[in-house]
Amino acid sequence: VNANVIKDEILALKEQGSTIIFSTHRMESVEELCENIALIHKSNKLIEGKIGDVKRQFRTNSFEVGILTNNVEGLMYDITQKFTVSPASFKSLNDDLKLNIQIGNAAPNELLNVLTQRGQVTHFVEKIPSINDIFIQTVTENKI
């Protein structure tokens, strides 16, 4: 309850145009409350910018896909010719094939075209990294 009261107060101050400096290790709070961020690790600023811009910078062009198909082999042949594919696990109401597909420099519509020719798409979501994922990746890559 106290965390919600604080969160509501921060959001109210933000709505009034106040600048709030927020220091936390809880990255889910950062995503919920902040517009601009600076990720600091061991006194080094690793990333700075608007949350959306930071996430765009770290996007991987990966999609979580669910598809109902009568021809799994044909579908897999078609998509592996153009894209990198791995199994996915997500909740679904269907007994669909679940895949993670990395499209590289291709447009999402190219993937959708291949999928819709081979079955009924039941799930299509871009996998956007969380701020926590970005922080871990950045710290690991910089070995700081």
Describe each region flagged by the PLM.
Residues 2-5, 9:
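Short alpha-helix in the ABC/ABC-like ATPase nucleotide-binding domain
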Residues 7, 55, 132-136:
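Conserved protein kinase catalytic domain
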Residues 1, 33-36, 57, 114, ...:
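Residue-level signal for well-ordered alpha-helical positions
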Residues 9-102:
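ABC transporter nucleotide-binding domain
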Residues 100-144:
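C-terminal coupling/interaction segments
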